[in-house]
UniProtKB/Swiss-Prot annotation:
<keyword id="KW-0689">Ribosomal protein</keyword>
<dbReference type="Pfam" id="PF00238">
    <property type="entry name" value="Ribosomal_L14"/>
</dbReference>
<comment type="subunit">
    <text>Part of the 50S ribosomal subunit.</text>
</comment>
<dbReference type="GO" id="GO:0009507">
    <property type="term" value="C:chloroplast"/>
</dbReference>
<keyword id="KW-0687">Ribonucleoprotein</keyword>
<comment type="function">
    <text>Binds to 23S rRNA.</text>
</comment>
<dbReference type="GO" id="GO:0022625">
    <property type="term" value="C:cytosolic large ribosomal subunit"/>
</dbReference>
<dbReference type="GO" id="GO:0003735">
    <property type="term" value="F:structural constituent of ribosome"/>
</dbReference>
<keyword id="KW-0934">Plastid</keyword>
<keyword id="KW-0699">rRNA-binding</keyword>
<keyword id="KW-0694">RNA-binding</keyword>
<dbReference type="InterPro" id="IPR005745">
    <property type="entry name" value="Ribosomal_uL14_bac-type"/>
</dbReference>
<keyword id="KW-0150">Chloroplast</keyword>
<dbReference type="InterPro" id="IPR019972">
    <property type="entry name" value="Ribosomal_uL14_CS"/>
</dbReference>
<protein>
    <recommendedName>
        <fullName>Large ribosomal subunit protein uL14c</fullName>
    </recommendedName>
</protein>
<dbReference type="InterPro" id="IPR000218">
    <property type="entry name" value="Ribosomal_uL14"/>
</dbReference>
<dbReference type="GO" id="GO:0070180">
    <property type="term" value="F:large ribosomal subunit rRNA binding"/>
</dbReference>
């Protein structure tokens, strides 16, 4: 579960390394976000000489959480870190590569471009 002030790793090569969640999109008083939710975040750490810079406000979709994800078939998935992929206003990823495994639920939420870039889909 991701809430405001939560730090996340960036799972793509967009230029950001670490994000801090400042808003969860959806409802006006939504407290937690899970895999597949879109958040508004600020870049806390960035790679030098890249298009994204520190303290820039961006949108991102959550691809991994430490909190368990229960599937309908009884399977439980848990990751070692909280990670997100930076997206633009249309929902397309800003980077050209995605690092690490991502959940299959992103395909059902119409993030097919992120799923196609991922090396492993669980």
């Amino acid at each position: 579960m991701i809430q405001t002030q939560t730090y996340l790793n960036v799972a793509d090569n967009s230029g950001a390394r670490e994000l801090m969640c400042i808003r969860i999109l959806g409802a006006s008083n939504r407290r937690y976000a899970n895999i597949g939710d879109i958040i508004v975040a600020v870049i806390k750490e960035a790679v030098p000489n890249m298009p994204l810079e520190r303290s820039e406000v961006i949108r991102a979709v959550i691809v991994r959480t430490c909190k368990e994800l229960k599937r309908d078939n009884g399977m439980i998935i848990r990751y070692d870190d909280n990670a997100a992929v930076v997206i633009d206003q249309e929902g397309n990823p800003k980077g050209t590569r995605v690092f690490g495994a991502i959940a299959r639920e992103l395909r059902q939420l119409n993030f097919t471009k992120i799923v196609s870039l991922a090396p492993e889909v669980l």
